[in-house]
Amino acid sequence: MANSFLDSLTLVRQNTPLVQCLTNSVVMQFTANVLLAAGATPAMVDTPAESAEFAAVANGVLINAGTPSAEQYQGMTKAIEGARKAGTPWVLDPVAVGGLSERTKYAEGIVDKQPAAIRGNASEVVALAGLGAGGRGVDATDSVEAALEAAQLLAKRTGGVVAVSGAEDLIVSADRVTWLRSGDPMLQLVIGTGCSLGALTAAYLGATVDSDISAHDAVLAAHAHVGAAGQIAAQKASAPGSFAVAFIDALYDVDAQAVASLVDVREA
Amino acid sequence: MANSFLDSLTLVRQNTPLVQCLTNSVVMQFTANVLLAAGATPAMVDTPAESAEFAAVANGVLINAGTPSAEQYQGMTKAIEGARKAGTPWVLDPVAVGGLSERTKYAEGIVDKQPAAIRGNASEVVALAGLGAGGRGVDATDSVEAALEAAQLLAKRTGGVVAVSGAEDLIVSADRVTWLRSGDPMLQLVIGTGCSLGALTAAYLGATVDSDISAHDAVLAAHAHVGAAGQIAAQKASAPGSFAVAFIDALYDVDAQAVASLVDVREA
Amino acid sequence: MANSFLDSLTLVRQNTPLVQCLTNSVVMQFTANVLLAAGATPAMVDTPAESAEFAAVANGVLINAGTPSAEQYQGMTKAIEGARKAGTPWVLDPVAVGGLSERTKYAEGIVDKQPAAIRGNASEVVALAGLGAGGRGVDATDSVEAALEAAQLLAKRTGGVVAVSGAEDLIVSADRVTWLRSGDPMLQLVIGTGCSLGALTAAYLGATVDSDISAHDAVLAAHAHVGAAGQIAAQKASAPGSFAVAFIDALYDVDAQAVASLVDVREA
């Protein structure tokens, strides 16, 4: 059945995966609330003194260098080491990579440390693959379609899943390309919906790691969960303040059947 | 009268205590909004260059090492010095102590600097007392009952009040043990409800320091205020996004009588 | 026509100015959501390695030293250099200047680097002008009227616009003084409404820089937009949690005519 990937939503709620987020200060609160509403447990342990230790007990790790202090860069490097040693899946969100030189260099340095998934917008994925110059701040200037080659290149290089967020989302692994139509444009007007999707991707990977659900399906399910919640929120709210509230509510309320009926999945 | 502790709510609103929060980046915004809604004034002055100076003008200080950068640790140490010199009550929230070694060492180093109150979950309080290993990230794995001995030990050692948050809250000082039944499970699904309770505890201590209300009653009242607001919010909302909004509203709207009628206080 | 300044709201929505915010951790999320709701694009690029580079592509820069780490101070200095070199307008929000010695010294050091606008409360503006001692944390203890001389002094010294927030707002440039009556007292109970107004001021300046709208009118319009949204929110909500949601909604929904009909502008 085409929507079997949705079983992972049930696993997230059953396993309440502990997700360690090394992420930017702008979205920490929202990311934590997204994880809690979705059924996961957040912990923003990001200092070099603690991040490796914690990555060994976490079920998933998010690395998002959105506002990277020197100390947080060190914390990220340590967390990745800790995650790899412990076999904890980690997710790379290359925020604004391409657009800014220091973080581009940093992301290029960690992309080969086997992230289980990469999640970004088209311009970030294109830039991370070395195929383009990046977007405008956190906004993409490339189309999702234009990022397909870059995503495939990165998927092969990392052995992980690469997800490109946009009007339609693109989920790519070495031998599979899936398109997901879901969500609502209003998601762009609430800060942190993209960044927290990176964290939720880590939650889904952590919750399904011992199941027969593939990493590709887990990443797809995380995106479908967020997209469906965006659609439900858009039915209830038409401005971004109340939309953000309705979005968190919907992440919590929505069940797998509702997600399946709201989103459109297409294997390419 | 059993609920005389509730007079402190009135004092918070009259005195608008200035609460200096050295807290983690995840909950800064929510903590500030909780303080404002409850009637206090927040100021997150946390750098070593300014924290001691500010602790002398603040009415209460919160120390919560949830995402502790090296610089913030220094700021905390300075703030505690400034608070003690000025006689400003300070509150220790030992987030994830026990679970992570560096912050455990730090918390053990400051616990003897006479915090007016300690507020944590059962596992954190047990670990801080040296009686156990801590929880899972920010989640408790010990029951509140199991933390009674640790709370009493810490209360005697510090001369302050120790509050253990859980299904029922436990408020302990050297010669008194109070159980508080209040709140709603949904509070666990909104990030920062626990951390902001630490800040509100500092607000209540600061607002009542020159009154005849005991520190024990002030800490109890802070917990009752939050618990009652959680109950009111749960009557209005059944998912965490709208619950968080209703919780802030209820902190602002609720009066002492309503708190008294909603919570259940039991001296042990 | 007295309300011609309101054309700048249309320009903000047309041009979606990219606003680089070097601001305090407490209000980053709220500031980003305010900018998005108003029609701008936020980017919190604040490290010394990236801030100058980004200031050259941003349309406006906000400098708000609310929780200033040593690294963020360096980032601010670099961002101002980058902004000046590129001709990007930058806004100074002197949070708690006067009340705390280190940030006062820092603000005094950058005030002569030609901020396009300064936005603060009365006590902050008075202290920045060297005419008084500052307020209580982030709260003003001077009246807006009492800050007129300080605002005029700073406007002449910087060549920019100086805005004093209060019960009525005061917008001052070298040869013009405008009073704005708008807003609602509930705005004071939501953290970040003042700080995000600084960011929105940068958005308005950035969006109108190539138009025939004066910087004075752009700053005035930013304040009117926020004030009107506060008034609309106050019609829908009577407690700060739901007020904050309604405020973001109103920033998004309100059009120039509605702003004009809600606020009261008076040239002095």
UniProtKB/Swiss-Prot annotation, chains A, B, C:
Pathway(s) per entry: Cofactor biosynthesis; thiamine diphosphate biosynthesis; 4-methyl-5-(2-phosphoethyl)-thiazole from 5-(2-hydroxyethyl)-4-methylthiazole: step 1/1
Gene Ontology MF terms in the entry: ATP binding; hydroxyethylthiazole kinase activity; magnesium ion binding
Cofactor: Mg(2+)
CDD domains assigned to the protein according to its UniProt record, in alphabetical order: THZ_kinase
Gene Ontology BP term (one): thiamine biosynthetic process
Binding site for ATP: 119, 165
EC number annotated for this UniProt entry: 2.7.1.50
Annotated positions binding substrate: 44, 192
Reaction equations catalysed: 5-(2-hydroxyethyl)-4-methylthiazole + ATP = 4-methyl-5-(2-phosphooxyethyl)-thiazole + ADP + H(+)
Superkingdom, natural source: Bacteria
Keywords on record: ATP-binding, Kinase, Magnesium, Metal-binding, Nucleotide-binding, Thiamine biosynthesis, Transferase
Keyword flag ATP-binding: yes
Family the entry assigns: Belongs to the Thz kinase family.
Function: Catalyzes the phosphorylation of the hydroxyl group of 4-methyl-5-beta-hydroxyethylthiazole (THZ).
Protein name as it appears in the record: Hydroxyethylthiazole kinase
Gene for this chain: thiM
